[in-house]
Structure formats: C-alpha cells, structure tokens
C-alpha cells in the first residue's frame, strides 16, 4: 500500500526533496546515489507530473547537480568525522525522509533523525528507525530534544533539509 501525500501540505516538501535525490541518483550516479529515495518514490502516492515537467529544463538539471554535490559532500564530512569518533551521534536536524545517517552508518554510531511530529509520523511509516537509530518528533527551536541525544562518543550535526525552507 502506498503512502498518500496531499498537495499544498508541509508533507509535500518531503516529496520534493525525495524526488530531487532520486533524480540526482539517475542523472549523476557517479557523484551521488540514494537507493532509499529511489525506493521511496515507489512507496508514495503523489502526482509527480508537475515535477516531471520541470525536470527537463537545463536549470532544473543544474539544481539536481547542486543537490548531488551537496549531499555527496555532506556524507563525506559525516563519514570523515566517524573515522575519528566511531561511536558518535549522527544527528540529522529537519530530517524529512533523508537517509544520510543510514548511508554513513559505520556499524557503531548512533543515528538521530529530528523533525516535526507530522513529518516523523510519515517517516515512521516509510522509514521506520533501524538498529541504533531513533526518529524524534520535536521542534528544533525547543532544545529539550538535546536530552535525547547520547553524545558521549562525540556528535556530528547536519541540517541539509532545514535551510531550504527557512
């Protein structure tokens, strides 16, 4: 059964980013490949026709390249940090349906995905937390969520999806 996403909702922003990562994976697989985004496209019931139409423009393809480079650089930095802090907390602020933490998992780190409650509800349905992973519903402006992060082995924070919409 597919997960239905309504137009003109906060959850629609999740679809736009998943679509962008899927297109990056298809157009620039040597730079960035997101198997989770490819799989999620099949799990989401949404009218992608408008996004498909825009995908053919040169400007949109450049945007996809920019996303691919940003995601690749971000994953590089997280993996590099984990080399010297293998049991660190990997904290994805405004995670949406992003699986960067999972793609950087070294088998010892702890992964924390933080977002609004309605977003975490979608994430739990489509990307349930795995081993050593926790999806936390919160408002990033209320720092009480810090109490849920075990940073005893260090911590690396990133917010790839937050600043696009702020």
Q: Where do the language-model regions lie?
A:
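Rossmann-like AdoMet
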Residues: 1-91, 95-138, 148-153
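A short SAM/SAH-binding and catalytic strip from SAM-dependent methyltransferases
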Residues: 154-166
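Short acidic active-site motifs
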Residues: 144-145
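Adenine-nucleotide cofactor-binding loop residues
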Residues: 141
